[in-house]
Amino acid sequence: MAKLKVNPTRMALSELKKRLVTARRGHKLLKDKQDELMRQFINLIKENKKLRVEVEKELSDSFKSFLLASATMSPLFLESAISFPKEKIAVEMKLKNIMSVNVPEMKFVKEEMEGSIFPYGFVQTSAELDDTVIKLQKVLDNLLSLAEIEKSCQLMADEIEKTRRRVNALEYSTIPNLEETVKDIRMKLDENERATITRLMKVKQMLQKDA
């Protein structure tokens, strides 16, 4: 702990006591914020873990279907079949506020062309390729949700660390320093008051002797 360099006056004492009250209130608010951030962060981590398992399984299934399609189709026809996407996809993003953290909300904006989701005819393609396209179509939304949650986790973790540093600074530096300085000024003021009383008593005794 380090005492603050201030003049030991009653005005300084009053000002420091106000700062101490403010620091304690700020510490409580930040600690409450930190606890709530941690609660929401843990929920996001659980959601992220569950969704990641789902996405990895869906992607693995899609890849297996694609391998089967590759085995049953000529490379030329396969490349030609998937070279021209059937729909244009953009990502629309807005922000939502969670405990002063702006986290992303994302969704796909699809510009679909007429007809089916398959970007090819069915004469020279296989059922395995159809299965691959269907599975990839289904996994897209989960992939975007996973990206949204993982970015939110990163932003929340940054805010938790920032809040933790502020809580620790108040708890282990600012508040103890203020408390120590307030205590020191009180002691000095008490000493000054006792010294003043002693001088006054001596003056009174001298006046009484002269009377």
Swiss-Prot record:
Protein's UniProt keywords contain Transport: yes
KW Transport (keyword) present: yes
A Gene Ontology cellular-component term: proton-transporting V-type ATPase complex
Pfam families noted in UniProt: ATP-synt_D (PF01813)
GO biological process: proton motive force-driven plasma membrane ATP synthesis
Keywords carried by this UniProt record: ATP synthesis, Hydrogen ion transport, Ion transport, Transport
GO function term, MF aspect, one: ATP binding
Family note: Belongs to the V-ATPase D subunit family.
Job description of the protein: Produces ATP from ADP in the presence of a proton gradient across the membrane.
Protein name per UniProt: V-type ATP synthase subunit D
Taxonomic classification: Bacteria, Fusobacteriati, Fusobacteriota, Fusobacteriia, Fusobacteriales
Gene (UniProt): atpD
